Curated annotation (Swiss-Prot):
Organism annotation: Mus musculus
PROSITE patterns linked to this entry: UBIQUITIN_2 (PS50053)
Ubiquitin-like domain location: 31-105
Top-level lineage group: Eukaryota
Protein name: Ubiquilin-like protein
């Protein structure tokens, strides 16, 4: 395929106006349209409701050509004659590209080659060797100039073109319209001989195999060469496909080219879906880290998801990298068994150990490890036998994140839930120390005393079952944090109301004895002498810290009764010195953050939009 390369000095763009008043003032309803040609650009003043056909008449009179030769392009779309400029969104200052066709109209190279026999404007070089390629020579153009303009090497731009006329767009159009050149390019034998002779063409075919199909198809080749004659349309198409690299045109808010027209567009779209699903899966364990009650399950349940044929254990390096506080909630669909590999508790060994459990599915296998204290036993074996709800040919894999999440969130089985809950209740009944530690986290003395006196009873098991189901919900922790925040504001704004809500404060560590009169507010303290020190993961300590924020300092009982202005006077001065002049906003931020200056600054910046 011949490669046409031309270089010419950049022509200065002449920009003059046509039909603009001398004073420069434009009446309403009149717009200025910039008409851009390959050589220059002109400003026309027309009415905004002008038809495209009427605008073509103005352009044809200016360029001295026929209306059928004009092609108007705006934002990558051809303007039709029956449309108006305002309907196509053309307003004052917009640019319209104009392409002027040749007078004889677009003709294919094959049609031009047929006329070559009758017109015979060139002679053929008949060599005795029987070479099938025909080299034509027209009047005023020798063979050397044709070859230099059509078969120029890639190094030619470094040297430059000798004559500015050769590099002009009009000259390129004339060369392509010449019958000798068209007959030369329509010769498929000549086209097939070009790649072996040109090294850069071979490299281009190796990098882009579609080029070889282009060389084999004569119709596509003719259409491509016909398109090369109109370089303005090619530039417009390239500007649409690369709007970020074109400073002249603003980004189009309504692109007309879909993602499927861009090379590898569907691949990028699919990769974005995969990344979104991965982020969604990675964010599921983060929702459970702040709940101290679900951490009880973290220390006992360790699930290893694998296929029935998987027998090779993971290396030690992969076990070390896995999270120690993560719970995998698997649905009953596709499960065959949940079997701990080490169900015998070891009460003598106090060293923390890893207890892997197996959850066999029909799909991809993943393994995770959870650090478990030695004195807390594992859950008993739970056998789940259920027919899968999908076909036999369907494979359920954790890699297909959207199917796994949909099945996990929407198709929970009552039988499996009851079996797991029953096993957990049985475990807590057999080990009251662990249940007491859980109640210890709740900071509740009444239930703690009731547990010591009535363990185990059927009533206690029923209450514990409901309690576990309620506390295992992540939204429960969020509700408790909201209650804690509201009580904190109430303690600072209206402490006189605290005795009236005494029955509702036991869950958050506020126990106001009935024998004490206001304002003697005494926070309840831990009282577990015969209990072992609780061992909970980091999320439990975070929840304890949050619950303890609501308690006033024990050294100064009247500290919570001070006015917020007096209590946070130093912090208020610090915020005002830093440039936060809104007194009420600073006070509310300090009340919400319990006097934490850094958190108050972050809250104020967030409210201001920074």
């Amino acid at each position: 395929m011949p490669r046409i390369i031309s270089r010419s000095p950049k022509m200065p763009q002449s920009r003059y106006t046509a039909g603009v008043p001398a004073d420069g003032k434009i009446s309403p309803g009149v717009i200025r349209v910039i008409v851009k040609t390959p050589g220059n650009q002109i400003i026309f003043t027309v009415a905004d409701d002008t038809l495209v056909r009427q605008f073509k008449e103005i352009l044809s009179a200016h360029f001295k050509c026929q209306m059928e030769q004009l092609v108007l392009v705006f934002m990558g779309r051809l303007l039709k004659d029956h449309d108006t400029l305002s309907q196509r969104g053309i307003t004052d200052g917009h640019i319209i590209h104009v392409v002027i066709k040749s007078k004889h109209g677009p003709r294919s190279l094959a049609h031009s080659f047929r006329n070559l026999v009758t017109n015979n404007p060139c002679h053929q070089d008949r060599n005795p060797k029987g070479n099938s390629s025909m080299v034509c020579q027209s009047a005023g153009m020798n063979e050397t100039k044709v070859e230099s303009s059509l078969l120029m090497e890639p190094e030619a731009p470094k040297v430059g073109t000798e004559s500015p006329e050769v590099g002009s767009l009009e000259h390129i159009a004339q060369v392509l319209e010449n019958l000798c050149v068209q007959s030369l390019l329509s010769n498929m034998d000549f086209v097939h001989q070009m790649p072996p002779e040109q090294p850069y063409m071979e490299e281009l075919i190796q990098q882009n195999p579609e080029v070889s199909h282009l060389l084999d198809n004569s119709e596509i080749l003719c259409q491509t060469l016909e398109l090369v004659r109109h370089l303005a349309i090619i530039q417009e198409i390239m500007q649409i496909q690369q709007p970020a690299q074109n400073p002249e045109y603003p980004p189009n808010s309504q692109p007309f080219l879909g993602l499927e027209t861009v090379p590898n567009g569907n691949n990028h779209l699919g990769q974005s879906y995969v990344n979104n699903n991965d982020h969604m899966l990675n964010g599921v364990p983060d929702l459970l880290e702040g709940n101290c009650f679900t951490a009880l399950l973290d220390e006992q349940v360790l699930e290893q998801v694998q296929t029935p044929s998987l027998s090779q254990p993971l290396p030690q390096e992969q076990w070390d990298q896995l999270s120690s506080s993560q719970v995998i909630y698997a649905n009953s669909c596709g499960l065959s068994s949940i079997t701990p590999t080490n169900a015998t508790p070891n009460h003598t060994n106090n060293v923390s150990r890893e207890n892997p459990a197996i959850v066999a599915t029909q799909g991809q296998s993943n393994v995770c490890a959870v650090q478990q204290p030695a004195e807390i036993p594992v859950l008993p074996t739970i056998s789940i036998n259920q027919k899968p709800q999908v076909d036999k040919d369907t494979t359920i894999t954790l890699g297909i994140s959207d199917q796994w999440l949909e099945e996990d969130l929407q198709q929970s089985d009552d039988q499996t839930s009851s079996q797991i809950t029953g096993g957990m209740i049985q475990l807590l009944r057999n080990h009251p120390q662990m249940a007491a530690q859980m109640l210890l986290l709740m900071n509740t003395s009444q239930l703690n005393e009731q547990w010591r006196q009535e363990t185990p009873t059927p009533l206690q098991s029923s209450q514990l079952h409901d309690l576990l189901l309620a506390l295992a919900n992540p939204k429960t922790s969020q509700a408790l944090l909201q209650i804690e925040h509201g009580l904190q504001l109430l303690a600072t704004e209206a402490p006189a109301l605290l005795p009236y809500i005494e029955p509702y404060l036991w869950g958050l560590g506020w126990l106001i004895p009935s024998i004490c009169s206001y304002p003697d507010i005494v926070p309840w303290t831990w009282n577990v002498q015969d209990m072992a020190e609780p061992q909970c993961p980091e999320s439990c300590h975070k929840s304890e810290t949050v619950l303890q924020k609501v308690q006033p300092p024990s050294g100064d009982p009247s500290h919570s009764l001070q006015a917020p202005e007096v209590r946070f006077s130093k912090e208020m001065e610090c915020l005002q010195a830093m440039g936060f002049v809104n007194y009420n906003a600073n006070l509310q931020a300090l009340i919400a953050t319990d006097g934490d200056t850094n958190a108050a600054i972050y809250k104020l910046k967030s409210s201001q939009g920074f």
